[in-house]
């Protein structure tokens, strides 16, 4: 299909189907489109609102361009769209560590923070993890240690083509939605946090279209995490269908506590580590409620209440922090 025809379609406020979005995305990443055309297409989708079909098409394209991690075991991911501006510590990464310590296999895919203070890669780098590990090594770490972190720019090098345009646009684009769904290990089980409520529908439908076995999409009262301060809206995707419900900390057996926030990278690292060691109550609880959903998605527990109990005990027993240190040391060898 003619790329210019797709651009005209977007210019008239029309949405693309998944195949058309795939073609457009390929045109962007291969350099076929100019920077002006890329900016126009990303802006048109943003103004209208990206659809689930468009996201699914872009994810399919991103997966084809990715450096593949050859997983030999079934793994999960925990990822968020970011952009909530809440200043919380990196809960999804800490929750992934806890889930791994409690028996899940985790291939955590992430990046540095693009708009906020602290991304998952910033945290992993700060604790000494080697961000340069290759795909075969990552697969072995998932199998042997139960956890590996893969740095998005290393596994999605084609995204560098669109980076200059994205940096100049004063808003987040479809690529911010695609990233969390484009795990290079092609995981089929995932916890996904969204910063905007409209993305609950978009991402859950996209996950269903992409054939996820079990995905849970969450928005926690303004943050792209499961919140400990109030209600979290949950869209649970299984067998191509999504179920919507809300959940509060008490439903998991957890108390309501303030989300752990930080005003610097150093403070964010310190609070996350204290939470993983069980030394900062609010951080430990916030990490555990997110890990509860990760363990549920992984099939380690039958429900999130059991997941929270397992997660908080894993933290209290010191296993979560030990798993982080094991992952860090294993990434260097």
UniProtKB/Swiss-Prot annotation:
Record text on cofactor binding: Binds 2 magnesium ions per monomer.
Top-level taxon in the UniProt lineage: Archaea
Binding residues annotated for anthranilate 2, in chain numbering: 166
Enzyme Commission no: 2.4.2.18
Example of a GO biological process term: L-tryptophan biosynthetic process
Chain positions recorded as 5-phospho-alpha-D-ribose 1-diphosphate binding sites: 80, 83-84, 88, 90-93, 108-116, 120
Enzyme class: transferase
A Pfam family per the record: Glycos_transf_3
Reaction catalysed by this enzyme: N-(5-phospho-beta-D-ribosyl)anthranilate + diphosphate = 5-phospho-alpha-D-ribose 1-diphosphate + anthranilate
Signal peptide as annotated in the record: none
Binding sites annotated in the UniProt record for anthranilate 1: 80, 111
Keywords per UniProt: Amino-acid biosynthesis, Aromatic amino acid biosynthesis, Glycosyltransferase, Magnesium, Metal-binding, Transferase, Tryptophan biosynthesis
Residues the record lists as binding Mg(2+) 2: 224-225
Recorded GO CC terms: cytosol
Cofactor dependence: Mg(2+)
Amino-acid biosynthesis listed as a keyword: yes
Pathway: Amino-acid biosynthesis; L-tryptophan biosynthesis; L-tryptophan from chorismate: step 2/5
Residues binding Mg(2+) 1, per UniProt: 92, 225
GO molecular function, one term: magnesium ion binding
Family: Belongs to the anthranilate phosphoribosyltransferase family.
Functional summary from the UniProt entry: Catalyzes the transfer of the phosphoribosyl group of 5-phosphorylribose-1-pyrophosphate (PRPP) to anthranilate to yield N-(5'-phosphoribosyl)-anthranilate (PRA).
Matches recorded under HAMAP family: TrpD
Protein name: Anthranilate phosphoribosyltransferase
């Amino acid at each position: 299909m003619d790329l210019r025809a797709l651009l005209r379609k977007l210019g008239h406020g029309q949405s693309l189907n998944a195949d058309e979005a795939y073609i457009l995305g390929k045109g962007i990443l291969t350099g076929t489109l100019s920077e002006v055309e890329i900016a126009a297409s990303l802006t048109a989708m943003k103004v209208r609102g990206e659809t689930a079909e468009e996201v699914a098409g872009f994810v399919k394209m991103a997966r084809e361009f990715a450096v593949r991690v050859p997983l030999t075991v079934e793994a999960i991911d925990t990822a968020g769209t970011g952009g909530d501006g809440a200043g919380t510590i990196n809960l999804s990464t800490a929750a992934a560590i806890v889930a791994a310590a409690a028996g899940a296999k985790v291939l955590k895919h992430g990046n540095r923070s693009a708009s906020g203070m602290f991304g998952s890669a910033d945290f992993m780098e700060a604790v000494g993890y080697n961000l340069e590990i290759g795909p075969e090594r990552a697969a072995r770490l998932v199998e042997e240690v139960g956890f590996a972190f893969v740095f998005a720019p290393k596994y999605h090098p084609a995204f560098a083509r669109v980076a200059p345009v994205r940096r100049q646009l004063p808003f987040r684009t479809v690529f911010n939605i695609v990233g969390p769904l484009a795990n290079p290990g092609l995981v089929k089980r995932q916890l996904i946090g969204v910063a905007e409520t409209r993305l609950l529908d978009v991402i859950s439908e996209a996950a269903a279209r992409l054939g996820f076995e079990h995905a849970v999409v969450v928005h926690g009262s303004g943050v792209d995490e499961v919140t400990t301060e109030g209600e979290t809206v949950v869209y649970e995707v299984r067998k191509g269908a999504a179920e919507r419900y809300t959940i509060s900390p008490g439903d998991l057996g957890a108390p309501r506590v303030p989300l752990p926030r930080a005003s610097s990278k150093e403070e964010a690292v310190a609070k996350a580590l204290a939470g993983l060691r069980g030394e900062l109550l609010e951080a430990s609880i916030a990490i555990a409620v997110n890990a509860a959903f990760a363990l549920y998605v992984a099939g380690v527990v039958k429900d999130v209440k059991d997941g929270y109990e397992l997660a908080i005990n894993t933290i209290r027993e010191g296993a979560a922090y030990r798993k982080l240190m094991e992952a860090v040391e294993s990434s260097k060898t």
